[in-house]
Every structure is written in structure tokens, then in C-alpha cells.
């Protein structure tokens, strides 16, 4: 049976004095058998020449417990002073062996590593913080390939050290270097502070970090120094104060996990005894108790049973609890008093965040702790307005029958007669006229029962009806530290070995999805009883959670020069780049086209200028546009999408990839396309009105007539003022132009001919006089198309369409309108543009006037 103590506590302390790791490290500059043999030949002058190769073989195949069997004297003799002058690279591991035996500290090892001269470090010019690279995660294959060239250190040799990586290392990517440091127990941070032990500097380091290093006088080393640090550090971080503190923390985590596992065992034993007694007495068994404990899913078996067991999001859970605890008091105040946290005005709460982080579990536990009965509905099953009215509406002002059979003297049953409605997966509901989103938002405004809504995407357009209606409570992905103790408890309970240092990789692989992590452990435990650094890469690759990136993330990733370097191209292949395009193949080409001019290229060919690279990228984008026209044409050549991915996104980005000069901008093409459609519609309307007095098409009207109209309709106001009103109206009547057409014509001009500033120079009295006189006169009207002057809005003129993101269900039949919502389908003449109604009199009506008099006058008008 394996035990977690192999990774924590006493057993780890005994490994500190082992000597097998150091002897293996002697030849670890290149981890090959030849190096080991060569090193053993070098040490053949010592008293025990044949024991060292044997210890190396044992160390490769045995567990850390086997390391204790190696004798200390052989280790001391191998590090005799006569060996040190031989060669610098070969003697360092030998000195490391003696250091490990003499209980050195981490500071002793750091003092032996030469510090970098900060004046010779190349600083990134015009540096801006790169959020994406700072949060980038290394690929498992990348870590395996790059870590293989590093010397292998002792278990937890960097324990107690806080390391910061900055800049570009010569042979190691940022993610791989951080994973290597975490593998040996180091704490890796992004920023430098007084708690930082050492900084590993590379090329193009941040200037602010260099200033911080000088200010705090922190040790700075390069990649070679990082190798020496791993090779020279003793097991368990040595005897320093920081290492001892880290060991105590690991031991405390081990004790907590052990206690929680023991409590789980006791609860299972008590539960099995109760079930056995119930079966003997012939009592009723609940559905959950029928399934044996060993047959349950781990996500159910190890689900939190109280709020203290919820991993992360403590603030969000307490906010939800306070809202629900004060709900009845807020109801008595008619939800008019916000309270201290501002939640007293909301009848409903909206929990939103990524899947698998405990939103539904938190809602259930909060309701149970406060004594509420729970009515849960899956909103994605109750998608339409009809089903929502049938299934949920009647429960909004009802009571729980279960509460009448509970003992009211118990604290948890104080709210037993009340229940809370939990609507899960709200973002899966249908929008539009027949969808349930709008109806559910109405429920949130008038419900007499606490309503908890749960969704993943709060910012979807169809979720806007819930704005200012629900109390928004955001749940975030928990970090590895908040999940670690729970996972270690599960590992102890299920009797398999889980290295605490690989939990970060598990969380990274699943992107903080606790549910997926537990399912991962459940599946792996059937085939192996150990999860450590030897198999974590294979596990991470198999269980990697694929999430479609958003357009901003895709553009930043594609325009990053690192993925086009020699190392980056091996780890992030062409297929991976094309896969980025397919995350959003509608927006990716537009985002690349918008931002490809905002980079500082780092992948230029020798002798190639930035302008030449931009020209090649622009030419390729134009070719991609030709391919897209074929794809979107009537031929529907969707098989050309991979070619379009290369021409429109991958190839242009590869030419100009590097560092972003600013932030990623959203594509302006959408706005410009909408603007062009608007002006095309206005031009078509003006052409339709003026065609009785002109003989040209729309293009000719824009190029030839509109500049003349500008001179005849605008310039007279600047020269003559109010005296030009009559002449301007006369010109408009000659060409059948309306007042709206006058405004539209003035919007068409761009560049030096823009009219915005000129119109502001016209006095306000002239503008108002022009409007009043035009409205007081009758004007010739061109022939209008049928229905073009009357806007829609009646029941007979519009059809209700569901939200474009959802498919209409078979049960989504049209809902008959209520009596009070019935509208007259007859044509409303008040909305006709050509029929004008007299303004209502401003004088106050006398009390003796008949109510029908005004109606008669309105009818005659």
C-alpha cells in the first residue's frame, strides 16, 4: 500500500541524507549512460571505485527509500580536494555531493553561483507588460523535450525558494522553466518582492524588474546558473530557515488531509451501519442510499457537505449566504432598502462563472444551511415561455410541504416551510419573442420566493434582460492551493500516491475545473496508483481541456513571435495555428487584418525590412479575401477553409509576428461595413426621390449631384442667413427632397469637405426658422412605394423570431396573446410620414368642456 508520507514529512527528511541522487547527478550534465560511465572512470582513483556505478543503477530504478542504503563514507571520499581542479563541469557535481552530506543551506549554494552583471543585460525597449506571456502555460511535450537537457536534481531540492523568471532564456521557454522549478518544490511568482530568493534573467528582461533587483539587492542568475542551482541544491531544500518552514507547511497539509480522510472513513462506517439497520427493520431506503459507496461517482462521493469544504470563492459564497439570509427581511421592506452590501433590493441572484467550479454546489449548501427546501429546474430543459409558465410560475408564491413535517425548534429548519428555486444553465434558454429568457426576467421582478439563477456566460446578448434585475455574484476558477488539500484527502482515502507538486499541472490541464480533476483521478486510479512527474506529462496531454479562445486571445497568440521561432514551431505546429483559426473562423481574419500593422516584428528574414514584411502580409490577406468569396458564394466551397486559414491568418501573421506595440484592437471592419450599408440605403432613398428631376444612377448621384446639392443647400445659409430659407426650400421642392434628405446629404461628405463644422457656424435662429417654415408649407411628393411610408409594429406586419443562437424546439408553439395584449392590426395612419397631425393645444382645458370635443377636432384634422 502506498502512503502520502512518501511525499511529506518524516520520510522526506530521511531522504535528505541520501547519497544516490548526488552520485547520479555527477554525470547529469547530459543524462546518458556514457556520462555515467565516464564519471565512474574519473572517480576510479578513490577507495571505492566499483560502488559508484552500482549506486547509479539503483538510483535510476529504485524509489527514494532505496537511496538510504548507500554509505556516506564513499560519498565523502568522492568529493576529495584532489578531484576539484580536474574540470569545472565535472567537479561541480562532486562538490555537490559533499555539500549534501554536510547539511548546507540554499544560501550556501547560491553564493557559489556567479551573479549576473546587470549592466550587461539586454533590456526590452518600450516595454509594456505582456499579460498573455505572463499567463502562458507550457505544452506538456515542450516541457518533456526541454527539461530533458537539464541535470536531474534531488527530490524537492528547491523547497523554500521563491524564484522569478524574466526575459527570454536561451534554450528554455518560460512555461517549461516555471514547470521545472515547481517540479522541485520552488514557489514561482511573477513579480519581484522582498521574499524573492533568486531571479533567473534572460534576454530582453523587463526594465522595472531590473530596477527592483538593484533596489532589493536580490541574487540574479542566468540559465546556466539555474542549472547549477538544481544540480547543487540538497534534497528537501537543505537546512535553511525557509526550507524548514516549507517542510512544516507540507507536513501540516499532510496532517489535515489525513484527518479529513479519517473523518470520511468514519462517516462511511456510520452510514453503512444505518443502512444495514434500515434493511433489517424493513424501512424505506432513499434513492441515494441504494447505491453502494464504492460504486458512486467520485464527484458525488466527495462532494462538499458543508460550506467549509467548498474550494475557493469564499467571498462569493458568503455574499450569496448573506443575501439569502436577509431575503425575508428584504421582502418585508418591499425590497426598497439596499442594505450594507446593496443586495436588499434584489429578489433573485445570478451565479456565473466557468463550469465545474462549484456554483450549483454552493447554492445547494447555502440553502440547506439556512433551512430552505430546494426546488431545482434545469433551465436548458425549460427553454420556452410556455414551459416556463407551466413549470415555474405556480411555484413563485407557494410554500414547501416538506417544511410542515420538520421540527421547527431545530435551527436549520427555521425556514423549512419556504423553499428556494434554483434555475441551472440559464444561458441555455431560448431568447427572442417565444424564448424563456424574457419571461424568467419578469419572474425575477415579482417573485415571492428566493430565485437563484446559474449560468456560465453572463455577458451574452440574450442575458441582458437580467441586467439590474438580479444580484450578480461571480465565481472564479480556484487556484491550486485552495484545491490541494481536498485532492490530497481523496488520494489518501483512495490509497493512491499523488505528488503535491504536480497538482498545479492538473489544475492547469483542466483550467481549474474541479469536477474534471476529480474525474481524472477516478479514471487514472483504476490503472495506476501513482501520479508524479514521471507520468504527469502523459496524463496532462490525454486530459487537456480544449477551450475555444476568444478573438482577442486568438489574435494575440497568432501575432506572438515565439510560436514562429525554431523552438516554438516545433512545439506549436502549423496544425495548431490552423486550429486557432477554427476557434472563430469568422472573426480571426478580421482581427489579424486589424492588428497586423501594430507589431514590432521579431521574425524578419536577414536583409528584410518591416515595410517589405507588411507588403507580403497585405498581399496574402487579399488572396485570402478571394478565397473567402469562393467559400461564401453560391458554390459553398467550405472545403477551402484550411487554405483560407493559412492565407488570411497564419501566413500574414508569420510575416509580422513579434511584440505588440499596443493593445489588441477589435476589428473596425464591422463598424465600417454597417456604416457603408447605412449610407448606401440613404443614397438609394435620395436617388428614388430625385429621379423625377435627374437622369443618373446612384453612383453618378453621389459623385456629381451631391457636391452641387451641398453648394445649393448649405452655402446660402452661410452667406445670406435667414434670407436664404426660401431659395433653399425651392431647390428642395424642385428635386422632391424632404427635410430628412437635407440632413442625409450633409452626412455624405468626408475629408476636407465634411460639413459638421460648417453646420455649427449657422446660427440657431436660422436653423429653427428653416425647420418651422419647411414644416408649415406643403411640398410636392414623389411616388412612394407601397408601405414605404408606414412603419411596422402591428401584429400582422411582423413575425416573432426566436433568438438566432438557439434552435426552436418542437414544443415551442406560438403562444396565444392575452386579451390585454391584443393589438389592432389595422393600419395606423398616425405613423404615416406624409400625414401630419396638429399639435395639441398647450392651454389647460376648462372643467366644463366636453370630453368628446377634442376627439371631434382631432378627427377633422
From Swiss-Prot:
List the protein's name. Replication factor C subunit 1
Question: What is known about its subunit structure?
Answer: Replication factor C (RFC) is a heteropentamer of subunits RFC1, RFC2, RFC3, RFC4 and RFC5 and forms a complex with POL30/PCNA in the presence of ATP. Interacts with ECO1 and POL30/PCNA.
| Composition bias, Acidic residues | 803-823
Q: Which PANTHER family does the annotation name?
A: CHROMOSOME TRANSMISSION FIDELITY FACTOR 18 (PTHR23389), REPLICATION FACTOR C SUBUNIT 1 (PTHR23389:SF6)
Main location class: nucleus
Looking at the record, which segments are called Disordered? 1-103, 788-861
Polar residues bias spans: 16-28
Motif Nuclear localization signal: where? Answer: 830-834, 855-860
Sequence positions bearing Phosphothreonine: 38, 63
One GO cellular component term noted in the UniProt record for this chain:
nucleus
Q: Which organism is it from?
A: Saccharomyces cerevisiae (strain ATCC 204508 / S288c)
List the gene name.
Answer: RFC1
Q: What else is known?
A: Present with 2360 molecules/cell in log phase SD medium.
The organism's lineage is: Eukaryota, Fungi, Dikarya, Ascomycota, Saccharomycotina
An annotated GO BP: leading strand elongation
Family statement drawn from the similarity comment of this UniProt entry? Belongs to the activator 1 large subunit family.
Amino acid at each position: 500500500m502506498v502512503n502520502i508520507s512518501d511525499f511529506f514529512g518524516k520520510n522526506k527528511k530521511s531522504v535528505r541524507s541520501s547519497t544516490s541522487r548526488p552520485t547520479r547527478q555527477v554525470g547529469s550534465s547530459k543524462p546518458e549512460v556514457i556520462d555515467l560511465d565516464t564519471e565512474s572512470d574519473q572517480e576510479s582513483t578513490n577507495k571505492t571505485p566499483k560502488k559508484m556505478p552500482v549506486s547509479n543503477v539503483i538510483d535510476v530504478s529504485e524509489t527514494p527509500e532505496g537511496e538510504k542504503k548507500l554509505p556516506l563514507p564513499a560519498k565523502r571520499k568522492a568529493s576529495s580536494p584532489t578531484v576539484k581542479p580536474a574540470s569545472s563541469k565535472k567537479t561541480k557535481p562532486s562538490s555537490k555531493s559533499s555539500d549534501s552530506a554536510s547539511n548546507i543551506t540554499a544560501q550556501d549554494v547560491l553564493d557559489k553561483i556567479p551573479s549576473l552583471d546587470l549592466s550587461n543585460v539586454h533590456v526590452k525597449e518600450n516595454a509594456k507588460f505582456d499579460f498573455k506571456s505572463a499567463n502562458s502555460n507550457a505544452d506538456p511535450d515542450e516541457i518533456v523535450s526541454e527539461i530533458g537537457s537539464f541535470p536531474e536534481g534531488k527530490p524537492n531540492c528547491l523547497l523554500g525558494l521563491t524564484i522569478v523568471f524574466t526575459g527570454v532564456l536561451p534554450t528554455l521557454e518560460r512555461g517549461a522553466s516555471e514547470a521545472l522549478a515547481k517540479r522541485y518544490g520552488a514557489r514561482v511568482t511573477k513579480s519581484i518582492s522582498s521574499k524573492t530568493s533568486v531571479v533567473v534573467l534572460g534576454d530582453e528582461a523587463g526594465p522595472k524588474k531590473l530596477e527592483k533587483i538593484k533596489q532589493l539587492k536580490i541574487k540574479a542568475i542566468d540559465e546556466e546558473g539555474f542549472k547549477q542551482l538544481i544540480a547543487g541544491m540538497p534534497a528537501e531544500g537543505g537546512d535553511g530557515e525557509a526550507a524548514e518552514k516549507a517542510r512544516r507547511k507540507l507536513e501540516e497539509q499532510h496532517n489535515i488531509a489525513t484527518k479529513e480522510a479519517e473523518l470520511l472513513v468514519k462517516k462511511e462506517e456510520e452510514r453503512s451501519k444505518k443502512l444495514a439497520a434500515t434493511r433489517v427493520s424493513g424501512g424505506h431506503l432513499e434513492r441515494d442510499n441504494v447505491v453502494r459507496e464504492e460504486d458512486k461517482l467520485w464527484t458525488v462521493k466527495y462532494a462538499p457537505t458543508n460550506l467549509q469544504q467548498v474550494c475557493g470563492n469564499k467571498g462569493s459564497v458568503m455574499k450569496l449566504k448573506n443575501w439569502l439570509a436577509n431575503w425575508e427581511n428584504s421582502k418585508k421592506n418591499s425590497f426598497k432598502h439596499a442594505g450594507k452590501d446593496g443586495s436588499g433590493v434584489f429578489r433573485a441572484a445570478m451565479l456565473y462563472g466557468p463550469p465545474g467550479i462549484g456554483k450549483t454546489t454552493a447554492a445547494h449548501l447555502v440553502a440547506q444551511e439556512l433551512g430552505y427546501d430546494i426546488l431545482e429546474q434545469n433551465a436548458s430543459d425549460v427553454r420556452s415561455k410556455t414551459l416556463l409558465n407551466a413549470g415555474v410560475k405556480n411555484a413563485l408564491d407557494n410554500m414547501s410541504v416538506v417544511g410542515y413535517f420538520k421540527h421547527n425548534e431545530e435551527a436549520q429548519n427555521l425556514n423549512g416551510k419556504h423553499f428556494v428555486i434554483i434555475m441551472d444553465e440559464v444561458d441555455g434558454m431560448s431568447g427572442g419573442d417565444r424564448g424563456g429568457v424574457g419571461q424568467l426576467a419578469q419572474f425575477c421582478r415579482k417573485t415571492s420566493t428566493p430565485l437563484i439563477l446559474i449560468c456560465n456566460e453572463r455577458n451574452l446578448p440574450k442575458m441582458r434582460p437580467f441586467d439590474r434585475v438580479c444580484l450578480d455574484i461571480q465565481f472564479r476558477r480556484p487556484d491550486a492551493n485552495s484545491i490541494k488539500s481536498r485532492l490530497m484527502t481523496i488520494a489518501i482515502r483512495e490509497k493512491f500516491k499523488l505528488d503535491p507538486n504536480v497538482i498545479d499541472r492538473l489544475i492547469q490541464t483542466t483550467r481549474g475545473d474541479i469536477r474534471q480533476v476529480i474525474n481524472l483521478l477516478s479514471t487514472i486510479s483504476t490503472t495506476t496508483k501513482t501520479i508524479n512527474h514521471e507520468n504527469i506529462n502523459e496524463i496532462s496531454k490525454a486530459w487537456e481541456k480544449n477551450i475555444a479562445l476568444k478573438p482577442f486571445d486568438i489574435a494575440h497568440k497568432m501575432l506572438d513571435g515565439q510560436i514562429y521561432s525554431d523552438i516554438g514551431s516545433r512545439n506549436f505546429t502549423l496544425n495548431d495555428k490552423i486550429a486557432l483559426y477554427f476557434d472563430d473562423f469568422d472573426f480571426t481574419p478580421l482581427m489579424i487584418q486589424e492588428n497586423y500593422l501594430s507589431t514590432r516584428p521579431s521574425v524578419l528574414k536577414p536583409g528584410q525590412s518591416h515595410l517589405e514584411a507588411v507588403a507580403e502580409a497585405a498581399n496574402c490577406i487579399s488572396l485570402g479575401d478571394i478565397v473567402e468569396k469562393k467559400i461564401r458564394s453560391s458554390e459553398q466551397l467550405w472545403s477551402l477553409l484550411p487554405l483560407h486559414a493559412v492565407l488570411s491568418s497564419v501566413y500574414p501573421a508569420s510575416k509580422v509576428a513579434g511584440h505588440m506595440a499596443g493593445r489588441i484592437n477589435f476589428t473596425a471592419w464591422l463598424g465600417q461595413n454597417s456604416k457603408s450599408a447605412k449610407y448606401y440605403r440613404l443614397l438609394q432613398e435620395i436617388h428614388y426621390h430625385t429621379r423625377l428631376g435627374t437622369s443618373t444612377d446612384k453612383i453618378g448621384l453621389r459623385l456629381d449631384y451631391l457636391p452641387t446639392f451641398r453648394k445649393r443647400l448649405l452655402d446660402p445659409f452661410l452667406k445670406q442667413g435667414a434670407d436664404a430659407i426660401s431659395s433653399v426650400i425651392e431647390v428642395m421642392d424642385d428635386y422632391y427632397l424632404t427635410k430628412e434628405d437635407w440632413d442625409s446629404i450633409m452626412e455624405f461628405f468626408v475629408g476636407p469637405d465634411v460639413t459638421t463644422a460648417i453646420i455649427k457656424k449657422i446660427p440657431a435662429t436660422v436653423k429653427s426658422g428653416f425647420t418651422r417654415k419647411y414644416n408649415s408649407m406643403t411640398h410636392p411628393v414623389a411616388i412612394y412605394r407601397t408601405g414605404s411610408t408606414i412603419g411596422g409594429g402591428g401584429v400582422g406586419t411582423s413575425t416573432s423570431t426566436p433568438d438566432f443562437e438557439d434552435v426552436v424546439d418542437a414544443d415551442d408553439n406560438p403562444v396565444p396573446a392575452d386579451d390585454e395584449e391584443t393589438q389592432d392590426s389595422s393600419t395606423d395612419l398616425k405613423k404615416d410620414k406624409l400625414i401630419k397631425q396638429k399639435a395639441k393645444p398647450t392651454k389647460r382645458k376648462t372643467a366644463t368642456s366636453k370630453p368628446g370635443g377634442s376627439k371631434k377636432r382631432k378627427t377633422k384634422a
